[in-house]
Amino acid sequence: MNWSNTPSFLEKQRQRLERYQFQIKVSEQGRVVSVGDGIIWIKGLPGAAIDEILISEDECCIAMVFHLTEELVGAVMLVQTKKLKAGTPIFPLKRVLSIPVGDKLLGRVIDPLGHPLDGGEIPPHEEQGLLDRLSPPILHRDFVNRPLYTGNKMLDNLIPIGKGQRELLIGDNGLGKSALALDIVMNQKDKKVYCVYVLIGQKRSTVSSTIQLLKEANALDYTTVVVAQATALPGLLYLAPFAGCAIAEHWMKKGLDALVIYDDLSAHANSYRELSLLLRRPPGREAFPADIFYLHSRLLERSTCLSPALGGGSMTALPIIETKEGEMATYIPTNLISITDGQIFFDESLFSSGFLPAIDITKSVSRVGGKAQHPQIKKESGRMKLDYLQFLDLELFTRFGAKLDAKMQKQIQKGRVLREILKQERFSPLPIEFQLAWLIAYNEGFFDELNLEDIPKMLKKIEEEIKQSTLSLGSPREQWKKAIKEWLMA
């Protein structure tokens, strides 16, 4: 063996020393000044950044940087602990919050940090999604051009929603906003739409009943539930919608369709106001901080329809907001109305009169959903919303004893028939084929001679026949007309 070209041991060490570069590892350490109400004030940490994660020495405390001053760092607690006190060392992790994402979260109930609340295993961490990230730029977006079927007669026909749209559900407490949202989730079964239901500031009983309803409808198979209860730390209430958005965003970027429901953003706005006041930020209108509009806009702008070049995925957002005595002109509702692509308004007087869902057509609008509506549905619904609004005006005159001619009386009768048709029980989503069937039946006058009490029976008959029929949205109208006539005559 030739050893002449083999470097000696000393030569190897010399080469290693030449390559060696001395690096000083610098780590920051701060100390707790005060702690209380879910807020930590920390001295030190000159390199701290907004949204950065902080931990204590024994890792019993996890917090997030939320406010910076010249002397102190304000952080929000994300884990409840009694071990934290003044003088406790705090260390930055030099990274921002992320959450596990992916198909393995389907059927799970988690908190905004990704911890399981259903007694199951900890979700795998192979795929992570940032809680807060920039929304897709304009060039990465596409027009809303595909319908999201809700299973609701009023929405699918008069206030249609498209995939990638942001539609606000607004109204007083207890009028059925959450029930409608659950209806929409239940209707996505077998439609390849992944759902995320975010419960923000809800009571434990409400959380339990919501999860139970999803289980009974077999909707948990394609749904992830993110929960921040009313008793949770304000920091978790603040993070909950961002966690749900990150989970849904993962499916959108994979070219799939996702639906995320924020129930509700009133509690989210209140938690943000609480944190801001505790951190001594200057209050603005209704004591909310000045950037509350930016907070909700950067959350909702992440919901969109991506261009085909990026997979064509979509994320539809249905934020829920609560009003007081039907007042829409308050700060947070007006903010969200201006951010979203339309709103569905729930009216207390309609609810009291037994008209369910208590959706006020006069104040509800879908600005982009009409472009995504199926041509057959769009053609049949046509002027229906306008005709219904005219009927409401005419009916108002009859209450004052005004005399109407035969044409107007016929229009009022037809409007009352339509109002009876649009009534729908909770948690009973209907297939889109049924929607087309009743539209054709209504336009052909098949309901005109019926008593209002008989209309639900006829609708039930159509619903039963639809389940056994081979007709689809693409079938010729004459086939639909002939089949419906036979069903109603039988």
UniProtKB/Swiss-Prot annotation:
Record localization: Cell inner membrane
InterPro entries the record matches: ATP_synth_asu-like_sf, ATP_synth_asu_C, ATP_synth_asu_C_sf, ATP_synth_F1_a_nt-bd_dom, ATP_synth_F1_asu, ATPase_a/bsu_AS, ATPase_F1/V1/A1_a/bsu_N_sf, ATPase_F1/V1/A1_a/bsu_nucl-bd
Site (Required for activity): 364
Annotated Gene Ontology cellular component terms: plasma membrane; proton-transporting ATP synthase complex
GO MF term set: ADP binding; ATP binding; proton-transporting ATP synthase activity, rotational mechanism
Pfam family, one: ATP-synt_ab_C
Cystine residue pairs: none
Catalytic activity: ATP + H2O + 4 H(+)(in) = ADP + phosphate + 5 H(+)(out)
UniProt keyword annotation of Cytoplasm present: no
Keyword Ion transport: yes
Main location as per UniProt: membrane
Entry keywords, A to Z: ATP synthesis, ATP-binding, Cell inner membrane, Cell membrane, CF(1), Hydrogen ion transport, Ion transport, Membrane, Nucleotide-binding, Translocase, Transport
Topology within the bilayer: Peripheral membrane protein
Record-listed E.C. numbers: 7.1.2.2
The family this protein is said to belong to: Belongs to the ATPase alpha/beta chains family.
NCBIfam families: atpA (TIGR00962), PRK13343.1 (NF009884)
Subunit structure: F-type ATPases have 2 components, CF(1) - the catalytic core - and CF(0) - the membrane proton channel. CF(1) has five subunits: alpha(3), beta(3), gamma(1), delta(1), epsilon(1). CF(0) has three main subunits: a(1), b(2) and c(9-12). The alpha and beta chains form an alternating ring which encloses part of the gamma chain. CF(1) is attached to CF(0) by a central stalk formed by the gamma and epsilon chains, while a peripheral stalk is formed by the delta and b chains.
Role of this protein: Produces ATP from ADP in the presence of a proton gradient across the membrane. The alpha chain is a regulatory subunit.
HAMAP family: ATP_synth_alpha_bact
Protein's name according to its UniProt entry: ATP synthase subunit alpha 1
Naturally occurring in which organism (per UniProt): Legionella pneumophila subsp. pneumophila (strain Philadelphia 1 / ATCC 33152 / DSM 7513)
